[in-house]
Amino acid sequence: MIRVADEVREVLGAGGAVVALETTLVAHGFPPGEGVEVGLESERQLRAAGAIPATVGVLDGEVRVGLTEEELGRFGPFARKVGPRDLAATAVQGSTGATTVGGTLAAAGAVGIRVLATGGIGGVHRGFPDPPDVSADLAQLARTPALVVSAGVKSLLDVPATAELLESLGVPVLGFRVDTLPLFYAAAGGPPVSARVESAEEAARVAEAHWQLGGGGLLLGRPPDEPLEDVEPLVEEALAAAAAAGVSGQAVTPYVLAHLHRESGGRTEAANKALVAQNARLAGEVALEIAPAEKEQS
């Protein structure tokens, strides 16, 4: 059911640094044809940091942990969005499935990968309980002993409510050199984090201590290097347009992203690409601090 790429298996077996990457971002996070390059750039950033990428997706009846460039190119807008509940059915039915953060965590956790990089995690949708929409990313993060590096929560969500739910689930929210949770495009203004860390090494130490105490996942919020502070009005406009058009469920995020790209003159897409790469680089640095083999050499 789970097929681990040879390189990923060898590095994991040797106690090396491996970082998981999702494929929903590749298939649905950017205009057709651009997501693959974003995924490849994340992989390049991980290798530059000294870690090995393990991009996760469902292909040909298997959950793949580690993809070739050709395999990554098969994840287009037609791919199913696959959360934790969908992995088995998608594989059995032979569909192409792009894994969400939650789906990626489920697969990565099953093979012992402890770090994941993404743009932003899912969470509580605005207007809850109408619609009653909460991402499965949160529950999977709570039960998987892994650290997720992101620019916070996706911009279209209710960030304070998501932070409250993470606290209820026992998920530490760390700020990378910041005291508040980054707001995806914006560097500051979110809820206070549970702890601030100043380095990849400190983040790794907190994560390892959390796991030694029986904890599950952690979120490490990294603010974007070049934040956009004027996006919130566009997000509200995009959500209103989605509601008026009858867009709901999993279709909301790509609809909103396309609206933001169009109305911002491409600034949001450029910022999104940059922060995804930045998060991958930091995730690679954290993975090096966690990897047993790297510790033995230091």
Say what each PLM segment does.
Residues 9-13, 18-19, 107-110, 115-117, ...:
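Solvent-exposed alpha-helices and their adjacent loops that cap or buttress functional pockets
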Residues 19-21, 54-58, 97, 115-120, ...:
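General beta-strand structural signal in soluble alpha/beta enzymes
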Residues 23, 28-30, 36-90, 212-226, ...:
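Glycine-rich nucleotide/cofactor/substrate-binding loop typically near the N-terminus or early
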Residues 68-145:
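Divalent-metal (Mg2+/Mn2+/Ca2+)-assisted nucleotide/phosphate chemistry catalytic cores
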Residues 100, 129-142, 146-167, 198-205:
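Active-site glycine-rich loop that binds ribose-phosphate moieties when present
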Residues 158-189, 205:
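Glycine-rich, Lys/Arg-enriched anion-binding loops that position phosphate/diphosphate groups
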Residues 185-211:
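Anionic-ligand binding region
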Residues 210, 214-278:
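A C-terminal functional module that forms or caps the active site or interfaces directly
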